Amino acid sequence: YYPGSEKLNPDEMRVVACGTGMPQPRLKQAGSCYLVELGNGDKFIFDMGKGSTERLAALGIPTDQLNKVLVSHLHFDHAGDFPSFWLARGVNAARQPLFLWGPGGGQNPDWGIKGWSEKIKQAWAWDVATRESSGDPRSTQLTVTEIDWKGVNQLFYDENGVKIYSIPTIHIDQSIGYILEWNGLKFAYSGDTAPNKWFLEHAAGADLAIHEVMLPPDMWLDKYSMSHTAAVMSGTQGHTTPRAFGKIMEIVEPRMAVVNHAQIDFDTAPVIEQEVRKNFQGPLSLAVDFMVWNIHKDSLTTRMTIGNPEAYPPPAQVPAMAPVASDDDYSWDPFSFSGLEPRTSAVTNEVVKEFNEKHGTNITPVVSNIPFQKK
């Protein structure tokens, strides 16, 4: 699949894996992230683990169309790239606000998606302040909605024919999974979880059922040099083994079962599939980054996406809004300008002058010209 080369049919769903890996960083697989595109024009991003922003950018989709993010839980391999995605919107021609959904606080209310997002704003306040005075103010606007993490089959989104439900998961308190239904199609995303009854019931019959899997305990001994106890705890508790995944899918009976959250390599993939097949014989995908599924009511295809590693931001979809001046606007300290040097600044100003002559503009350099302006 070459992004931008195929228009979705009005009744079609396309799902692109923009991150399929584990907490351990690796170039091959980013943290969990799935883009769901619908034939009605809606797009939803489920999780945004570390490294996923670059995968999304490689699809060449206008930034304003990627304005709905749903997070399953706040571990960094599922939410770690959200700050980068949010901050990059201004330099990627965003002209619309961003919407974020995620679980509310469990034992500590501040640990919910709202408290988390406020801390992100605080941590990156300098970045936002130094950019938004010259950018579209809508690009950093963020609307956050908390979801009750104990809600079972809880409808929290119902717009444009799309319904999205949350289900609890058994991972850490304050973790959820998602079920999206549209046009007779069903997408199920488990987030991180041990096998649980809620997914079995509410993901049943899904067209695409994405569920986490961890490597078998023996592989944790080999790949991560863990103790026997740590290998068992990491590979089986609060997560799902490949064999248990097979049992889950035997019960759920999806049109396509998708293994997520596992390192898919030449030596791990055969073991994972062998374990899954002990209980499940249906259609199966071992997800890797850029795998894509096109889903119709009467067909389902699995391919690989050829992303653009040299992508530039697509053009903005709506006109820019002028920056809004306020007393909180960032202003330069005059000390910074004392470091400018006439000979090198003159070269910069020469470039600006040539640009003005070429394009018929009259743009005044705001930095390189300041110390040398005539009084």
Labelled PLM ranges:
Residues Y1-F187, P270-L300, Q317-A320, P342-K375:
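Binuclear metal-dependent hydrolase catalytic cores
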Residues S52-R55, D173-Q174, P195-W198, M219, ...:
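A short local loop/turn or secondary-structure capping micro-motif enriched for an aromatic residue
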Residues V69, E212-V213, K223-Y224, P309-E310, ...:
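Short, intrinsically disordered/low-complexity patches at protein termini
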Residues E118, V232-G238, T305-P309, Y330-G339:
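A general structural signal for short secondary-structure boundary/capping elements
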Residues G184-K186, A194-M291:
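Cap/insert and terminal regions of metallo-dependent hydrolase folds
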Residues T302-A316:
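A polyampholytic, Gly/Pro-enriched intrinsically disordered region
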Residues P314-V347:
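Extended, charge-rich low-complexity interaction segments
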